[in-house]
């Protein structure tokens, strides 16, 4: 196993709802990261080819055409687009973790929020489907299964991934920790609105004025860092938090046809942006950098600019903390707790 792992986290926007162009961009980023000696290249949640932000900002009855386009621009796990990404991993000699909106072979409208970890020979090491789409995501994606709750054993270490809100699921995280995970990838969208900035008029029934802005909107930066750091501390592993970037083409697609375009635009502009960053096995920030004019430049995180963030990880640093809290070893009571995980792939029908 290599003593030092260099990870490249792509804080990048897709060509929104364009699978072919997004795939081409992903391949270019893989090659760029490989040229900077990365061993593992990571992409955000459903990088190919969009995250359905519109479902949080517009009523479902306004979004039929967007769902149709999302289906058209989603890809098969064994389709041409993912095959091209696999070839880029093979030709560049790197591992790739990439999120994508996955088409189902069983239905012409069923989608999954999925992620592949691809090996240096272009082989698929892990194919994970998000267990439960979160909140408004249920309008786009179907629930996955436990098949992808696996840690990839590679020449660069033991690497696992969970998608967005799955990093809130203690049992899913424990399942990864129990496979001796050394590097945990968490992937996130650029924004995740839980309310618009529009106020709701007084109720006709009780006369109480309620505002949808009451309480804080969802803060991707704080919420993601909290969950990612907690996992690193509990697992004594390194963390890669890779978030999407919202391009202008996404703004145009989300606002187009909205019944309240001003509200949608204002909310999109005001929402906190997610960040891409690295964590060490204590949950603390890990020093990271970008390349500017072929020179390293220290950078704690990426949030407001597209780029590739790099960090070097000494995987032996995962060992010391296990003396204190090995929650799948000496700090666990296996005589009390018993967790079983079904990792079978679930199909809608079995033909005999």
What spans do the regions from the language model cover?
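N-terminal glycine-/serine-/threonine-rich phosphate-binding loop
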Residues: 1-40
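Metal-dependent catalytic neighborhoods of phosphoester/phosphodiester hydrolases
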Residues: 47-64, 70, 107-108
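Short beta-strand segments at enzyme active-site cores
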Residues: 39-45, 96-100, 240-242
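Generic short beta-strand
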Residues: 115-116, 122, 272, 276
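A short, polar/charged loop-to-alpha-helix boundary motif
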Residues: 130-144, 295-322
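Beta-strand-turn-beta hairpins that frame and shape the catalytic cleft
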Residues: 1-7, 151-160, 182-183
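CN hydrolase (nitrilase-like) catalytic-core segments centered on the catalytic cysteine
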Residues: 76-97, 167-309
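A conserved C-terminal secondary-structure "cap"
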Residues: 312-352
């Amino acid at each position: 196993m290599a003593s030092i792992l260099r990870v490249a986290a792509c804080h990048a926007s897709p060509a929104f709802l364009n699978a072919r162009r997004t795939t081409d961009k992903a391949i270019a980023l893989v090659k760029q990261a490989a040229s900077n000696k990365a061993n593992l290249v990571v992409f955000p949640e459903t990088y190919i080819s969009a995250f359905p932000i519109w479902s949080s900002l517009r009523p479902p009855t306004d979004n039929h055409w967007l769902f149709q386009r999302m289906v058209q621009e989603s890809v098969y796990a064994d389709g041409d687009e993912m095959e091209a990404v696999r070839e880029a991993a093979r030709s560049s000699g790197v591992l790739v973790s990439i999120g994508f909106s996955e088409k189902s072979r069983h239905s012409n409208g069923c989608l999954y929020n999925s992620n592949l970890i691809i090996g240096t020979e272009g082989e698929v090491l892990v194919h994970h489907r998000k267990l439960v789409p979160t909140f408004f995501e249920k309008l786009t994606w179907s629930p996955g299964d436990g098949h992808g709750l696996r840690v990839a054993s590679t020449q660069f270490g033991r690497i696992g991934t969970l998608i967005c809100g799955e990093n809130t699921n203690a049992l899913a995280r424990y399942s990864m920790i129990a496979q001796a995970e050394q590097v945990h990838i968490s992937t996130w969208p650029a924004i995740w609105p839980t309310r618009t900035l529009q106020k709701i008029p007084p109720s006709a029934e009780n006369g109480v004025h309620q505002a949808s802005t009451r309480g804080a909107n969802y803060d991707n930066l704080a919420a993601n860092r909290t969950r990612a750091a907690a996992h690193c501390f509990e697992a004594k592993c390194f963390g890669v938090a890779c978030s999407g970037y919202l391009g202008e083409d996404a703004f145009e697609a989300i606002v187009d046809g909205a019944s309240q375009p001003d509200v949608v635009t204002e909310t999109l502009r005001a929402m906190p942006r997610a960040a891409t960053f690295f964590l060490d096995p204590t949950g603390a920030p890990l020093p990271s950098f970008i390349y500017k004019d072929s020179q390293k430049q220290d950078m704690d995180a990426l949030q407001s600019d597209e780029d590739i963030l790099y960090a070097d990880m000494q995987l032996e640093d995962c060992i010391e903390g296990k003396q204190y809290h090995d929650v799948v070893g000496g700090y666990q009571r296996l005589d009390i707790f018993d967790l079983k995980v079904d990792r079978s792939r679930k199909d809608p029908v079995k033909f005999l």
